[in-house]
């Protein structure tokens, strides 16, 4: 194990919304180092979201991310030969990372023509409290609730 925590690399805000969270999302969306392509997909998806909902695509995306952000998760801990799933609160930076990764993963898994279409549909679904990424958050919370009896163990 390393002795010190590595320094966080400061991210540059994105050109359109001047938001570091957008850059973080685009970095996860990026495929094979093609960042400009990832930005095009993201902005295109937000335009499609705005067209579908009639509201700002950026605001809907923020709401969708908030909706799929997990509060608790289960972590495995081996105690006396048995492995227990112990519920634990999720750190703030991990919350954001998980929600971004889930949205990108389940957007890729969707059926659709282009990645922008699939991402737009997942954003709209997540903002309404539907979709695969929202279901993942609910499943995570359900697992933590089911294993509440082991919450007294330390992680």
Where are each of the predicted segments found?
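Strongly charged
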Residues: 1-32, 36-39, 43-155
């Amino acid at each position: 194990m390393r002795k010190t925590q590595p320094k966080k690399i400061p991210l540059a805000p994105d050109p359109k919304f001047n938001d570091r969270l957008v850059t973080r999302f685009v970095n996860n969306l990026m495929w094979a180092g093609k960042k400009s392509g990832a930005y095009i997909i993201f902005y295109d998806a937000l335009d499609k979201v705005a067209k579908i909902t009639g509201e700002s695509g950026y605001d809907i995306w923020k709401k969708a991310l908030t909706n799929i952000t997990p509060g608790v998760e289960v972590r495995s801990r081996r105690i006396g030969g048995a492995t227990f799933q112990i519920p634990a609160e999720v750190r703030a930076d991990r919350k954001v990372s998980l929600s971004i990764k889930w949205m990108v993963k389940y957007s890729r898994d969707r059926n659709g023509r282009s990645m922008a279409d699939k991402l737009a549909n997942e954003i709209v679904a997540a903002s309404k409290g539907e979709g695969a990424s929202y279901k993942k958050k609910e499943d995570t919370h359900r697992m933590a609730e089911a294993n509440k009896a082991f919450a007294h163990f330390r992680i």
